[in-house]
Amino acid sequence: SKLMLAAVVLAGALSACALKQNSFLLATPDQPKDQAGHQAKPGWATQGFSVAAANPLATAAGYQVLKAGGSAIDAAIAVQMVLTLVEPQSSGIGGGAFVLHHDGKKVEAYDGREVAPSAATDKLFLDAQGKPLPFMEGVLSGLSVGVPGTLSVLETAHKEHGKLPWATLIQPAIQLAEQGFKLSPRLHQALLAENDLINDAVAASYFYDAQRKPHPVGYVLKNPELAAVLRDIADRGSLALKQGAVAQALVQKVRQHPTKPGSMTLQDLAQYKVIKREPLCFDHVVQTTGKGFQICGFPPPSSGALAIGQILGILNNTPAGKMPLQQGLPDSDWLHFYT
């Protein structure tokens, strides 16, 4: 069914100016290429703003929002909505997200990670004999689907830092879903490596041809079912995934898994709460110049900022911090301390 396709996509995977729905004219830039081996990338520096995303279509959507007078949060919302469509193997509104926001004065951390359903216990991934399930058996089941938080966290951040109307920010993704987008090499490779998605009839009809092979790179995928979901999101915000037909389809998909059904309920969806956390910040001084920085990132349950702080803290207790760069690059001795 139409809603079930949207549920497959969701279960599988952070005021001033009003714009008309057709104000976003989306060109199709080059799609991301396959990452095979080392590639040299130029450095980029900007003075006004920049947008970085995993797919150029998403980057373009964020750029257009900023040009229209939107805030960084506005742009991030447009980016995430497009990624839900064009990068379903990696990112989507059916999962969770961290949002780290800095306005030049204050750093804020919004935790929108997915959470376990209320009925989950510490035996969730154990078999009848009390032994751990094989990893992929647990992943490819209703057991591994958490209560999604991405829409809620983006909505919360938008209420505090958004400039453009919420519905405006969903329009680029709606247009691409209806008009179609070219299947990228990255998505194509992910489908080639995937052995189980083909067994879902709804997903198979979308991603694969009649010979059960992934559609080729450049094939135009249209997703009117997801466009309908996005229109509901434009109208109702995060409630679109908490109450109503889409929420019911999502719960049904999880609870009716043929071998390992999950326990997620409509009440789990409705009760999801975003958590405002204290950012993890630490001071770092470049010993060769004496210049100091405050580096901030997301606190646990994220691990990136914590790991960076540990790495820099360890380096500061070695000679590495005082070693000058050679033509802007560290030498082999520095790399020895780093590794």
Question: PLM features: what roles do these ranges have?
Answer:
Residues A6-A13:
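Bacterial N-terminal signal peptides
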Residues L280, T289, F293-T339:
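Internal alpha/beta scaffold segment
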Residues G12, Q39, A201-A203, L329-D333:
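Alpha-helical structural elements
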Residues S1-L5:
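Bacterial N-terminal signal peptides that target proteins for export
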Residues N22-A60, Q64, A72-R236, L241-Q243, ...:
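Noncatalytic scaffold domains of N-terminal-nucleophile
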